[in-house]
């Protein structure tokens, strides 16, 4: 038997690399069948069968001790069991799914709504110039943890977070304040394997679903490896990034843990411009395969509507004066457009009876204020409604003295009808009677 046949693909390359005089072989990126056979044996029979297959294939040990424990801990049985198997007409066993393959359409869970695809006009990240900035943990002037916290605190509309581990209570407080105090909708995707750490933190802080009115917490896994027997295990989420207002991205090695902010060395990238589209697409794909955990289960996409806060703080930037006038509060203040346009002022007589105010529309929820991140559009103050223009200028007047209209220059709004006090005034002045009749000379 040729000795080279007893060597697996990886073992052969290692032996050639150790031999200085061996001929350099061409790089091979093809599929390794020995690795698949060994992994299937690990799922079906355990470590002993795994080592046996490696020995038969002449391959090196592919997995570390931690990787072996991870696979053994996360093995999932196939969707069917022996109890559900029935014997067919030809004596072969058949399961209820008619196939050993996994059919997502047979799932009992509700499907995640199809995510909206951006149009060229709606992509907010295309409005900014493409740039990239790097932050290192050793740079004390631009601390990585503080950079992330500033990003959360400066977000004004929506925040999308994909994280492997979330146990930092201070960052979690920033997220809660953004959602509950500033009405920012937060999409939080967490790794399913470390989700229990996040739930434990919420239990310690006594945070429940009722405190997450604007937060959607969902779990997601990595890719799934499935053996021929149907047993499988899922990978972890090692991607970590934050999308703020769909305009820039923070990504790197940083995890939302206390150790990452204090002792672990990490780096952080900040991207803006066209590259944000890649992160947006990745987040939407992961969101579609995620499962609800806490907070809102399935936020319905609604058109964005601006809302005036009770504290007077707008959800937009303080430099935008249009954000204080909304369609939900048409009587909150006079719009700028209606003041500058004199042609829309009412010419009908002003009534002295109180004008009943129409019932204001209910306060819009954050789901109505901020669309699902898949259907984002720029928040622009809606134009003033013409139906309300007359109500803006109807005032309740008290009877004015007769001298008011002679000493005040603002009586051009006065009605042409005679008011009651006008009849008590003389129609003609005595000083002008000499011009009432023509004189003959």
Swiss-Prot record:
Coiled coil: none annotated. SUPFAM superfamilies: Phospholipase D/nuclease (SSF56024). InterPro entries: FAM83, SACK1. It is found in: Cytoplasm. Keywords: Cytoplasm. Residues 314-327 have a biased composition (Polar residues). Residues 81-108, 312-368 are annotated as: Disordered. GO terms for cellular component: cytoplasm. One of its GO terms (biological process) is cell population proliferation. CDD domains: PLDc_FAM83A_N. Residues 328-354 have a biased composition (Low complexity). Belongs to the FAM83 family. May function in the epidermal growth factor receptor/EGFR signaling pathway. This is Protein FAM83A. It comes from Xenopus tropicalis (Western clawed frog).
């Amino acid at each position: 038997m040729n000795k080279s046949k007893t060597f697996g693909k990886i073992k052969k390359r290692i032996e050639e690399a150790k031999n200085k005089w061996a001929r350099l072989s061409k790089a091979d990126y093809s599929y390794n069948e020995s690795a698949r056979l060994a992994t299937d044996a690990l799922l079906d029979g355990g470590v002993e069968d795994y080592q046996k297959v490696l020995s038969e294939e002449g391959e090196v040990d592919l997995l570390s001790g931690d990787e072996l424990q991870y696979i053994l801990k996360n093995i999932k049985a196939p969707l069917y069991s022996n109890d559900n198997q029935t014997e067919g007409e030809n004596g072969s066993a058949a399961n209820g799914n008619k196939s050993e393959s996994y059919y997502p359409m047979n799932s009992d869970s509700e499907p995640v709504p199809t995510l909206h695809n951006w149009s060229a006009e709606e992509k907010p990240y295309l409005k900014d110039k493409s740039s990239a900035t790097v932050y290192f943990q050793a740079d004390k002037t631009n601390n990585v943890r503080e950079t992330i916290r500033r990003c959360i605190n400066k977000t004004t509309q929506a925040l999308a977070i994909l994280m492997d581990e979330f146990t930092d209570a201070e960052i979690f407080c920033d997220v809660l304040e953004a959602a509950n105090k500033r009405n920012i909708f937060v999409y939080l995707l967490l790794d399913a394997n470390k989700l229990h750490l996040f739930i434990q933190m919420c239990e310690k802080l006594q945070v429940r679903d009722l405190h997450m009115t604007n937060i959607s917490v969902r779990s997601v896994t990595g890719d799934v490896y499935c053996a021929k027997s149907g047993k499988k295990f899922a990978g972890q989420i090692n991607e970590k990034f934050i999308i703020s207002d769909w305009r820039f991205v923070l990504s790197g090695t940083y995890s939302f843990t206390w150790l990452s902010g204090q002792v672990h060395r990490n780096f952080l990238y900040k991207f803006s411009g066209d590259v944000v589209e890649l992160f947006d697409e990745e987040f939407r794909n992961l969101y579609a395969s995620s499962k609800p955990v806490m907070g809102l289960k399935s936020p319905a996409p609604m058109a964005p509507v601006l809302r005036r806060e009770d504290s007077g703080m707008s959800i937009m930037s303080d430099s935008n004066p249009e954000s204080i006038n909304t369609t939900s509060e048409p009587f909150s203040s006079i719009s700028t457009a209606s003041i500058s346009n004199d042609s829309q002022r009412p010419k009908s007589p002003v009534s002295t009876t109180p004008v009943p105010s129409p019932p204001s529309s209910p306060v819009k929820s954050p789901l109505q204020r901020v669309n699902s991140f898949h259907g984002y559009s720029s928040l622009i103050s809606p134009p003033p409604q013409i139906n309300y223009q007359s109500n803006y200028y109807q005032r309740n007047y008290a009877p004015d003295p007769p001298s008011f209209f002679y000493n005040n220059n603002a009586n051009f709004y006065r009605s042409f009808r005679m008011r009651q006090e006008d009849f008590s005034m003389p129609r003609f002045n005595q000083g002008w009677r000499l011009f009432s009749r023509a004189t003959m000379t």
